[in-house]
């Protein structure tokens, strides 16, 4: 049973996350030959203030992009 964990910043809708999980499931069915019922996907979301890239939190990066 393949288990996939997706770590990402918060902010996507439930519909977006469900679509992503469906697409990942189908990719595993196609490429690994497993049944969809065997695929487990978990999303771990972090607040934007708890994620950093390039020495700036995602909150800081978003604020800089608006300028």
From Swiss-Prot:
It is an enzyme of class 5 (isomerase). Keywords: Isomerase. Pfam families: Tautomerase. Disulfide bonds: none annotated. Transmembrane segments: none annotated. Its EC number is 5.3.2.-. The active site is at 2 (proton acceptor). GO terms for molecular function: isomerase activity. PANTHER family: 2-HYDROXYMUCONATE TAUTOMERASE, TAUTOMERASE-RELATED. Belongs to the 4-oxalocrotonate tautomerase family. This is Probable tautomerase bsl7456. It comes from Bradyrhizobium diazoefficiens (strain JCM 10833 / BCRC 13528 / IAM 13628 / NBRC 14792 / USDA 110).
């Amino acid at each position: 049973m393949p288990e996939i964990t997706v770590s990402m910043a918060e902010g996507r809708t439930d519909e977006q996350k469900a679509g992503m999980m469906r697409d990942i499931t189908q990719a595993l069915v196609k490429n690994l030959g497993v049944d969809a019922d065997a695929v487990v996907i978990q999303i771990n979301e972090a607040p934007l203030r708890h994620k950093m890239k390039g020495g700036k939190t995602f909150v800081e990066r978003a604020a800089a992009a608006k300028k």
